[in-house]
């Protein structure tokens, strides 16, 4: 009888990838990056272990959306006080904090628990073309 392989958190080897978001569609890019953060692309994937890789996304300000989402997509947040709900459109969000758009899209595609929060920490998003992770020697990833 064969034994099913279970990844051990201490033995997981992590790689660094850099993804250029220029001209890419938001949801398509986010779903592929979320799969890499989870480790679904590895043959050693184990659901209860964080076995994903690190992902750096550059040029977040040049991400695209289809249809009328530029004006119609709304991001909500709440202060916790009565009447404290705030709404921001995609257009306003991309102007003020372009990296937040990608972060929210990818975070929504990860598990909503402790493991998902651990996976989310491996995501690094930058609005421009530069990133400070050259020492990790990230490989370019075409998505």
UniProtKB/Swiss-Prot annotation:
GO terms for biological process: negative regulation of translation; translation. Keywords: Ribonucleoprotein, Ribosomal protein. It holds the Pfam family Ribosomal_L13. This protein is one of the early assembly proteins of the 50S ribosomal subunit, although it is not seen to bind rRNA by itself. It is important during the early stages of 50S assembly. Part of the 50S ribosomal subunit. SUPFAM superfamilies: Ribosomal protein L13 (SSF52161). Belongs to the universal ribosomal protein uL13 family. The lineage of its organism: Bacteria, Bacillati, Bacillota, Clostridia, Eubacteriales. GO terms for molecular function: mRNA binding; structural constituent of ribosome. It comes from the Bacteria. This is Large ribosomal subunit protein uL13. GO terms for cellular component: cytosolic large ribosomal subunit. CDD domains: Ribosomal_L13 (cd00392). PROSITE patterns: RIBOSOMAL_L13. The gene is rplM.
């Amino acid at each position: 009888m064969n034994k099913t392989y279970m990844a051990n958190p201490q033995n997981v080897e992590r790689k660094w990838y850099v993804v250029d978001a220029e001209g890419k569609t938001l949801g398509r890019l986010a779903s592929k990056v979320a799969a890499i953060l989870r480790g679904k692309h590895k043959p050693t994937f184990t659901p209860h272990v964080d076995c994903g890789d690190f992902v750096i996304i550059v040029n977040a300000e040049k991400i695209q959306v289809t249809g009328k989402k530029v004006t119609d997509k709304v991001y909500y947040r709440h202060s916790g006080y009565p009447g404290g709900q705030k709404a921001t459109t995609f257009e306003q969000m991309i102007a003020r904090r372009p990296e937040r758009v990608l972060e929210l899209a990818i975070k929504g595609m990860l598990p909503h628990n402790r493991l998902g929060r651990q996976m989310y920490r491996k995501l690094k998003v930058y609005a421009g073309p530069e990133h400070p992770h050259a020492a990790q020697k990230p490989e370019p990833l075409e998505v």
